[in-house]
A protein has these predicted regions:
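Glycine-rich phosphate-binding loops of nucleotide-dependent enzymes
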Residues: 2-207
Length: 207
């Protein structure tokens, strides 16, 4: 998909995610202190700060890796009090990580397909015997992932094991896997860390 094919004219809507007075400590060390913000529909919101400022910890609070001692996270009007990363993903909150969490021996396409797991309805029997439901689901999932691959302009390396790819392309694959879950909120942790100028420019364009 070329740059001029990407529709950026999405209207900004009301709050989809609200972070209210979050505080998080590890022992006597305060990682986050009384922090609040919200994210509007179709908005890009950045959390900026030096290393150790608590940026990753904040994302971990949002998607359920950490539970803050104080404050709340509200998503679509629902307070996420006992959320886990899996539940967050099911509800439509997807993320990437500061340190890549890819399956290095799997191809770029197969890594992105992992992101479709939440949309899989076929059971073990359906898959084992390749029943129509499983075949239809596999076709739909591959089609969706092929669209993401085209959008991220990684068609030429989709069958390459991720471990053999340059770092910048691995970051694209990780973004693709997050997009494959079709999230409403996409949390990107240090999405351009370790990239050169050209790779950063490309990542900005995709975001």
């Amino acid at each position: 998909m070329s740059e001029n094919q990407i529709d950026r004219n999405f209207p900004i809507g009301g709050p989809i995610l609200e972070v209210n007075n979050i505080s998080l400590s590890f022992g006597g060390v305060k990682a986050i202190t009384d922090t609040s913000f919200d994210v509007l529909t179709h908005e890009i919101r950045a959390i900026i700060g030096p290393n150790g400022a608590g940026k990753s910890s904040m994302l971990n609070c949002i998607n359920g890796i950490y539970k803050p001692q104080e404050g709340s996270v509200v998503y679509h009007g629902e307070t996420l009090s006992k959320i886990t990363p899996n539940i967050a993903a099911q509800k439509g909150i997807s993320r990437t990580f500061q340190n890549l969490a890819l399956f290095k021996r799997m191809s770029a396409l197969d890594n992105i397909l992992v992101g479709r797991k939440l949309h899989s309805k076929a059971n073990f029997i359906d898959i084992a015997f390749q029943l129509p439901k499983a075949k239809r689901e596999e076709t739909e999932n591959r089609q969706k992932c092929e669209e993401i691959i085209s959008f991220l302009e990684i068609d030429e390396i989709k069958n390459t094991p991720v471990g053999k790819l340059p770092y910048g392309l691995q970051k694209r694959v990780e973004l693709g896997r997050a997009l494959a879950a079709e999230p409403e909120v996409l949390l990107l942790d240090e999405p351009m860390a370790g990239m050169n100028v050209e790779e950063k420019r490309e990542m900005c364009r995709f975001i």
